[in-house]
């Protein structure tokens, strides 16, 4: 499969739009006195699908981090009062992670800011993604 110059431009624009949002997210986290990974962890905990337990292993999976890195991350979050750990009811060896009221409030503030940014910048991101998808479909149909 060959790619035209426009294909590279479309991919580059999509990558730029993604990176622009990620940059906003990183800066916004820092303005709220969190490191970007801490913000991502709070969001991952709060946003887990129903029925998914908030374990270190699940967080490692969702954050693309190693187990020991998530342990260190949760240690820092717990020390700052953003999360609490609780022993599992069914499996006493299992440690579950929950947001504290302080963590939930910080995440809520950040999430509002992210939604506002996406309301403004989201259409550009969607357009860039749609350009890549359309080109991919055209090349697969040919």
Which residues fall in each region the model found?
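N-terminal leader segment of winged-helix/HTH proteins
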Residues: 1-32, 80-82, 142
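Short, structured helix-loop boundary elements
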Residues: 8-11, 35, 56, 115, ...
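Pre-recognition alpha-helix immediately N-terminal to the DNA-recognition helix
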Residues: 13, 20, 40-44, 105
